[in-house]
Amino acid sequence: MKKYILSLDQGTTSSRAILXNKKGEIVHSAQKEFTQHFPKPGWVEHNAQEIWGSILAVIATCLSEADVKPEQIAGIGITNQRETAVVWDKTTGKPIYNAIVWQSRQTAEICDELKEKGYGEMVREKTGLLIDAYFSGTKVKWILDNVEGAREKAENGDLLFGTIDTWLVWKLSGGKAHVTDYSNASRTLMFNIHDLQWDDELLDMLTVPKSMLPEVRPSSEVYGETIDYHFFGQNVPIAGVAGDQQAALFGQACFGEGMAKNTYGTGCFMLMNTGEKAVASEHGLLTTIAWGIDGKVNYALEGSIFVAGSAIQWLRDGMRMFKDASESEVYANRVESTDGVYVVPAFVGLGTPYWDSEVRGAMFGVTRGTTKEHFIRATLESLAYQXKDVLCAMEADSGIELKTLRVDGGAVKNNFLMKFQSDILDVPVERPVINETTALGAAYLAGLAVGYWKNQDEIKEQWHMDKRLNQQWKRKQAKSYMLDGKKQLKQQKLSNNHKQCYNGDKLIIR
C-alpha cells in the first residue's frame, strides 16, 4: 500500500493539511481559515479551540478528497506560526485565555519594564533574541498576571504552556505528549540556545513556573502517536516539528552553512544557516535554532519583517485598490517607477534591524500626479527595501557574501516583486518548483524520523528550481536607487509627533 507523509501547517490566518509523497511532491491539500480577534488596538488573538477544530477539519477533508486511507499515513509533521502562546488547564484541556498571537503588541509595557531593569544584555546572550512583545515569554506572563486565578493554578502545577506546535501535539496524542522542538523553544524568550535547556534566570525574570513548560526535543523524532478517535482509529506517529520559518529553511534544502531563504508570507522572514555555530548579531538580527536532528543542532541568523503579504492584503481589503492580490503586479508594471513615492509599511512597528514597536506606517513624495499604480508599486518596492536591510545585516554578521537567495511564500508568484528584489539585493533569486516549502520541511522532518526518507542528501536531490530571476541592474544602479529613495525620505517634513533617524544607509521613520 502506497504511503504518504501528512504535514499540518498551522499558520496565522489558516490551517492546512498537505499530503506529500516519496518524491517530495504535493499530492493534495486542504485549507480552512479561522477567526482573527482584535480586542484592542495592537492586540491580536486566536481561539486555540477553533484552531484545533480547523486542524481536524482539514485532516478529514484532505484525506477524503485525495482518497487516501488513514492507514496510508506513515507519519505526521507539524509546522506552526511561531511565538503564539497558549496556556491551558492540564485537567480539562481547555485554554484559560485566547492564544496571544506573535503579532500582538499587548505585552509592550512588560517589555519596557524588563528593558528598564537592565535585562536586555542577559536575554540577548542566552536566547539570541531581543526583549520584544513578539516573543512568547511576555505573553505567558501577561496571561498569568491578567487571568483571574491563573498564577495560583500555574504555581500549583495545574496549567500547561505551549506554542501552537505543543498544543497540537498534546491534542493529537490525547494529552500524552507535552513537547516542543528546539526551533520553537528558541522563540520563547525562556530557552537558553547554548545549553539547550529552559533557563531558570529567564523564568525568574518573567515569573513563569517551570512546571508549565513542555519537554524540548529534536525537530525530527517520534514524539508520540495519534489517539484512535482523533485519527480515524489509527495510531500514526507524530514525528516532526519545526516553527514555520525554520521548516521553510529545511524545505528549501538550505542545509549548507551560508545558504539562505526568504519567505514572503504575512510577514517576511529571511534565515541563513550558520551551521553548528550560534553567531551573535551586532546588526539587529536574531540568533535562533534552525533545527535539531541526528544529535546535532543547527543555528540560523534571522531577519524578521512584520509586514509583507499583509501590506498587499491591506491594499486589497483596506484601500480597495484591487480585488485579487495577483492584480498588484499588473498595476505595478503599468508605470516605470513610483515617481518619487515611498511607503513605510510599519503597520505594527518595524522588526529587523530597527526593532521599534512605536513607529507607524507612512507614505512620502505624494503629488497631484500620484496614481494608484504609483502607490501599489511603492508598496511592493517597500518589501524589497526591507529585505535589503536584512541581507546587509546578515552578510555583516556572518562574514558570508550571499551568492543566491531561495524564496518562497505567496508573494513569490509576483514576478515584479521578485525581479525588483533581485535588483535591489544584487543577488539572483531562486524560486522552487514546489512553493509549499514550509509544509514540505515539516514533512521531511517527520519522514526522516520514521525512515520514509533516508537522509538529507536524498532530500537535497528533490529540490528543483522553477525560475531564477537574475538582477538586471548593475550594482552602482541599485545603490543609487536605494540612496535616492532615502534622500527623498529625509527631505520630507514630518509632523511634530515623529522624528527621523538616519544611520549610514538606513533610514527609519519614528
Swiss-Prot record:
The EC number of this protein is 2.7.1.30
GO CC terms, sorted: cytosol
Record-linked PROSITE patterns: FGGY_KINASES_1 (PS00933), FGGY_KINASES_2 (PS00445)
A Pfam family reported for this protein in Swiss-Prot or TrEMBL: FGGY_C
Q: Which residues bind ATP?
A: T12, T13, S14, T266, G309, Q313, G410
Concerning InterPro entries, the annotation shows: ATPase_NBD, Carb_kinase_FGGY, Carb_kinase_FGGY_CS, FGGY_C, FGGY_N, Glycerol_kin
Swiss-Prot/TrEMBL keywords? ATP-binding, Glycerol metabolism, Kinase, Nucleotide-binding, Phosphoprotein, Transferase
Keyword set includes Magnesium: no
- Modification Phosphohistidine occurs at: H230
Write out the residues that bind ADP.
T12, R16, T266, G309, G410, N414
Protein modification: The phosphoenolpyruvate-dependent sugar phosphotransferase system (PTS), including enzyme I, and histidine-containing protein (HPr) are required for the phosphorylation, which leads to the activation of the enzyme.
User: What biological process terms from GO does the record include?
Assistant: glycerol catabolic process; glycerol metabolic process; glycerol-3-phosphate metabolic process
PANTHER family the UniProt entry points to: GLYCEROL KINASE (PTHR10196:SF69), SUGAR KINASE (PTHR10196)
- Which HAMAP family does this entry report, sorted A to Z? Glycerol_kin
Q: Which family does it belong to?
A: Belongs to the FGGY kinase family.
What protein name does the entry list? Glycerol kinase
This protein's species is: Bacillus cereus (strain ATCC 10987 / NRS 248)
